[in-house]
Amino acid sequence: MNPAPNLVMVGPMGAGKSCIGRRLAERFGLEFVDVDQAIVEQVGSSIPAIFEQHGEARFRQHEAETLQALLEQDNKLISTGGGAVLDPRNRERICARGFVVYLHVSVPAQLTRLARDRNRPLLQRADREQVLHAMAAHRTPLYHQVADLSLETDHLSPAEATAQLVLRLAAQWRMSSNPA
């Protein structure tokens, strides 16, 4: 089984962290928690409302506090927000308390997947493609920094991505529990 207390999903918005994460949690008997959804429940406001009323910095503070509290527990599959890796403390905590899966998605695939999504405050502008490219340039190295395992999701359905991850995670965890 998982050598870390939790399984943590990282990656950009639209990569499939929540959808695939729910499936993996069910498959491995873990409790699924979406950090953004946990923030919404705790604060009582939507993510766009938090950004509008309090700004991104306050949202990132909520994100760090929520992530820390979740990582102090065990047997969770934690789906992080795309920007969670921006905070060095989050990266440190994620690595210390989780086996980290990085779901990668290209900007063209993100644009397709997020075309009708109005719940992404950082994308509520005309230059969505440029914003996504800038985010990818800044965040991709951070995702790689924390990842124990990576999967490209551009051409995979959630079911296909889940099936691949189940096989790869099981193999990885077997190797971790049986050192040579």
Swiss-Prot record:
Q: Kindly list the positions annotated as binding Mg(2+).
A: S18
Any GO BP annotation: aromatic amino acid family biosynthetic process
Give the record's pathway: Metabolic intermediate biosynthesis; chorismate biosynthesis; chorismate from D-erythrose 4-phosphate and phosphoenolpyruvate: step 5/7
Which Pfam family is one of those matched by this entry? SKI
Subcellular location as annotated: Cytoplasm
| Cofactor(s) the protein requires to work | Mg(2+)
Instruction: Tell me which family the UniProt entry assigns to this protein.
Output: Belongs to the shikimate kinase family.
What is the designated name of this protein?
Shikimate kinase
